[in-house]
Amino acid sequence: NNLSDFIFGLIRAIGLILLGFGIVQVGLSLKSHDPSQRANGFLTLAGGVIITFAKEILNLITG
């Protein structure tokens, strides 16, 4: 159980890093008016949210 909590903690940290990176990408794309960078930023942002809440999503799926 401790190992599982540790692994999910690491996964959450990676998700938060991706989430922050996605926010920065979206902000930079709005400044430079770059639609492709904006799309990549939103995809990174969405991936970061999914990875951050992976444990909760798995608990919802498995019940």
Residue ranges and their predicted role:
Residues N1-G63:
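Hydrophobic alpha-helical segments involved in membrane association or supramolecular assembly
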